[in-house]
Amino acid sequence: MNVTLTKAELADLLFERVGLNKREAKDMVEGFFEEIRQALERGECVKLSGFGNFQLRDKPQRPGRNPKTGEEIPITARRVVTFHASQKLKAAVEQLSDASKQP
């Protein structure tokens, strides 16, 4: 079971459940993700209560290896975005996982 929820589908859900028109729903979804992106660009942590946290992490340079030649190649330092799920989200996912294992 590998189903993906897209931004377009989120907008459709807002249209159906909240009653926004399709344009407003699309703009709301786009605006939501744009705010998260801008906050991360400013170096801020994004905390969504009951869902999780998006944080920036600086990874130092480290040695890597070319898998074909075995030659050591440095992997440059970089900044990455990490996501840590909240305990509520972890518990909900675990509950679904446990329920699907029941006969």
UniProtKB/Swiss-Prot annotation:
GO terms for cellular component: cytosol. CDD domains: IHF_A (cd13835). Keywords: DNA recombination, DNA-binding, Transcription, Transcription regulation, Translation regulation. Gene3D superfamilies: IHF-like DNA-binding proteins (4.10.520.10). GO terms for biological process: DNA recombination; positive regulation of metabolic process; regulation of DNA-templated transcription; regulation of translation. SMART domains: BHL. InterPro entries: Hist_DNA-bd (IPR000119), Histone-like_DNA-bd_CS (IPR020816), IHF-like_DNA-bd_dom_sf (IPR010992), IHF_alpha (IPR005684). It comes from the Bacteria. GO terms for molecular function: DNA binding; structural constituent of chromatin. PROSITE patterns: HISTONE_LIKE. Belongs to the bacterial histone-like protein family. This protein is one of the two subunits of integration host factor, a specific DNA-binding protein that functions in genetic recombination as well as in transcriptional and translational control. Heterodimer of an alpha and a beta chain. NCBIfam families: himA, PRK00285.1. This is Integration host factor subunit alpha. The lineage of its organism: Bacteria, Pseudomonadati, Pseudomonadota, Betaproteobacteria, Rhodocyclales.
